[in-house]
C-alpha cells in the first residue's frame, strides 16, 4: 500500500523541498499540502509551487477537509503551528514526522504525550550525516571530553528565528549525556565583557546568522597542543527533506511511540 503524506508549511523553503522529496521517493505519494489560514497560496497546485509541475494536489488551509487524503503529516513549521497539528493528528490517528525546532519544555511534553496515541519521529535534524555526527561526538566525548574544552559553533541563514539551532543543542546534549553533565547547568550560550577564565566543564555555544547558509555545525574538542574538529556542512535542504521522507516510511508500520533519527537509522547498533 502506498503511504500518503501531507506537508505542513508547503509554501516555505523547506515545505517546497519536502514536496519534491515525496514526489521523487518510492512507495509514497503526496496526499495533501497545507498553509496557514488565509495564505495567498491556498488553491495553488503543490507541484507547481515546488517547481515540479502539476500534481493535482491543491494547497489547503483546512486539515479537517483533507483528513481522508493522508496517513502521515510532515511538519517543519513553528512550535505554535506544530502543536495545533499534533492535536489534530492525535484526534484523527495520523502519524507525524516533526522537524520543527524551538519548542519549550511544555511543547516537548505535548509531543511526548501525543506519542502515547500516535507514532512520531521528532528530530532536530533529519540529515543522515548529522545523525552520524551525533554518534561520533559521543565517541569523542568519551575519549577526550574530561580533558579538553568543548565548543559548538553553528551557522545558518539570516531568516532562522531560533538560536542556537536545534541541531547544535542536540550536539551539546549528546556530549553532555556522555559526560554525565546537565546541559542546562554546563552550557554557556553568551560571552560578553569580563567573563573570567573558561571553566573546564563548560560546553560553549557560538551562533552565526548570515546570508543563505543552509546549515553548518562544528564541534571543537580542544586540548593543549591539539584540537579535534568534527563538522558537518549542508549545501541543500534536500538532505533534510529526503531524511524526513525516509523517517515517514520507517513509521509506516508503527502504531505509536516517540522516535528519532537514531531509531530510523539504527545507529545504536553501530
Swiss-Prot record:
Molecular function per GO: 4-hydroxy-tetrahydrodipicolinate reductase; NAD binding; NADP binding; oxidoreductase activity, acting on CH or CH2 groups, NAD or NADP as acceptor
Q: Where found in the cell?
A: Cytoplasm
What Enzyme Commission number does this protein have? 1.17.1.8
Q: Where does NAD(+) bind?
A: 9-14, 35, 99-101, 123-126
Keyword list, A-Z: Amino-acid biosynthesis, Cytoplasm, Diaminopimelate biosynthesis, Lysine biosynthesis, NAD, NADP, Oxidoreductase
**Record keyword Cytoplasm present:** yes
Q: Which GO terms describe its biological process?
A: diaminopimelate biosynthetic process; lysine biosynthetic process via diaminopimelate
Q: Does the keyword NADP apply?
A: yes
Q: Which PROSITE patterns match?
A: DAPB (PS01298)
Query: What is the enzyme's main class?
Result: oxidoreductase
What Pfam families does its record include? Answer: DapB_C, DapB_N
- Active-site residues, as the UniProt record annotates them: 156, 160
Q: Which residues bind (S)-2,3,4,5-tetrahydrodipicolinate?
A: 157, 166-167
**Which reactions appear under catalytic activity for this entry?**
(S)-2,3,4,5-tetrahydrodipicolinate + NAD(+) + H2O = (2S,4S)-4-hydroxy-2,3,4,5-tetrahydrodipicolinate + NADH + H(+); (S)-2,3,4,5-tetrahydrodipicolinate + NADP(+) + H2O = (2S,4S)-4-hydroxy-2,3,4,5-tetrahydrodipicolinate + NADPH + H(+)
The metabolic or biological pathway listed in the UniProt record of this protein is:
Amino-acid biosynthesis; L-lysine biosynthesis via DAP pathway; (S)-tetrahydrodipicolinate from L-aspartate: step 4/4
One cellular component term from this protein's GO annotations in UniProt: cytosol
Where NADP(+) is bound, by residue?
Answer: 36
NCBIfam families, per this entry?
dapB
Q: Known PANTHER family for this protein?
A: 4-HYDROXY-TETRAHYDRODIPICOLINATE REDUCTASE 1, CHLOROPLASTIC-RELATED, DIHYDRODIPICOLINATE REDUCTASE
Report the HAMAP family cross-referenced here.
Answer: DapB
Q: What does this protein do?
A: Catalyzes the conversion of 4-hydroxy-tetrahydrodipicolinate (HTPA) to tetrahydrodipicolinate.
Which family does the record assign?
Belongs to the DapB family.
User: What protein name is recorded for this chain?
Assistant: 4-hydroxy-tetrahydrodipicolinate reductase
Q: What is the lineage of its organism?
A: Bacteria, Pseudomonadati, Pseudomonadota, Gammaproteobacteria, Pasteurellales
Gene name, please?
A: dapB
Amino acid at each position: 500500500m502506498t503511504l500518503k503524506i501531507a506537508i505542513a508549511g508547503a509554501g516555505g523553503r523547506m515545505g517546497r523541498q519536502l514536496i519534491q522529496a515525496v514526489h521523487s521517493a518510492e512507495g509514497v505519494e503526496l496526499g495533501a499540502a497545507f498553509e496557514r489560514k488565509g495564505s495567498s497560496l491556498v488553491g495553488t497546485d503543490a507541484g507547481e509551487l515546488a517547481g515540479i509541475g502539476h500534481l493535482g494536489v491543491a494547497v489547503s488551509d483546512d486539515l479537517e477537509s483533507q483528513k481522508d487524503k493522508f496517513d502521515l503529516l510532515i511538519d517543519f513549521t513553528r512550535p505554535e503551528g506544530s502543536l495545533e497539528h499534533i492535536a489534530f493528528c492525535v484526534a484523527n490517528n495520523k502519524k507525524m514526522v516533526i522537524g520543527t525546532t524551538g519548542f519549550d519544555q511544555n511543547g516537548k511534553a505535548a509531543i511526548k504525550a501525543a506519542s502515547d496515541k500516535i507514532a512520531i519521529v521528532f528530530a532536530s535534524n533529519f540529515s543522515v550525516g548529522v545523525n552520524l555526527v551525533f554518534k561520533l561526538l559521543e565517541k569523542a566525548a568519551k575519549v577526550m571530553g574530561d580533558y579538553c574544552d568543548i565548543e559548538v559553533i553553528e551557522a545558518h541563514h539570516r531568516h532562522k528565528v531560533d538560536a542556537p539551532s536545534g541541531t547544535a543543542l542536540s550536539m551539546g546534549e549528546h556530549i553532555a549525556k556522555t559526560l554525565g553533565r546537565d546541559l542546562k547547568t554546563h552550557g554557556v550560550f553568551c560571552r560578553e565583557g569580563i567573563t573570567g577564565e573558561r571553566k573546564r566543564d563548560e560546553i560553549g555555544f557560538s551562533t552565526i546568522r548570515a546570508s543563505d547558509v543552509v546549515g553548518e555545525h562544528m564541534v571543537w574538542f580542544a586540548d593543549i597542543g591539539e584540537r579535534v574538529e568534527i563538522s558537518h556542512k549542508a549545501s541543500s535542504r534536500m538532505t533534510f527533506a529526503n531524511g524526513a521522507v525516509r523517517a515517514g516510511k520507517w513509521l509506516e508500520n508503527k502504531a505509536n511511540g516517540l522516535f528519532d533519527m537514531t531509531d530510523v537509522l539504527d545507529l545504536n547498533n553501530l
